[in-house]
A protein has these predicted regions:
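Active-site scaffold of zinc-dependent metalloenzymes
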Residues: 1-22
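Bulky hydrophobic/aromatic "packing anchor" residues in well-ordered structure
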Residues: 10, 87-88, 114
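The catalytic-center signature of Zn2+-dependent metalloproteases
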Residues: 20-106
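Extracytoplasmic/secreted envelope proteins and their assembly/folding machinery
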Residues: 7, 28-31, 111
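A recurrent domain-boundary module in secreted/ectodomain proteins
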Residues: 98-121
């Protein structure tokens, strides 16, 4: 619903190291935040016990994937279980990003949500 309070803010300083901007991460963050604006939820929430309602998005279960037992699901722990999705709750670590890991995928149902979002019309 359009009004004067809708929008997305993204910190450039959170996506920079010195004078270098992490453009891939910035693009993924922008896509993620716009996904929220258009009606998408995190595929897996931080604790690995709450998931979106879409039946074709992967779930990363805390009970089987929280290898470091810190109660938070990292992209590394959830590789192959939704971490590659634009709407995963946490980005890859810098080391994984350097190895080519990205969050660029959307499921068919997520694409449908975006297609039919009233804001996107």
């Amino acid at each position: 619903i359009a009004n004067s309070w809708n929008g997305v803010l993204i910190s450039l300083t959170a996506h920079a190291s010195g004078t270098t901007l992490a453009s891939q991460l910035l693009g993924e963050t922008a896509a993620h935040e716009m996904g929220h604006q258009l009606g998408l939820f995190h595929t897996t929430e931080s604790g690995g016990t709450v998931f979106d309602i879409l039946t074709d998005t992967a779930e990363c279960l805390n009970s089987t994937k929280d290898f470091d037992r810190n109660g938070k699901m990292s992209a590394e722990e959830c590789e192959g279980y939704g971490a590659q999705n634009v709407m995963f709750w946490r980005p890859w670590t810098p080391a994984s990003r350097s190895a080519g890991k990205k969050q660029e995928t959307l499921s068919s149902h997520q694409q449908q949500v975006l297609k039919y979002s009233p804001i996107a019309k």
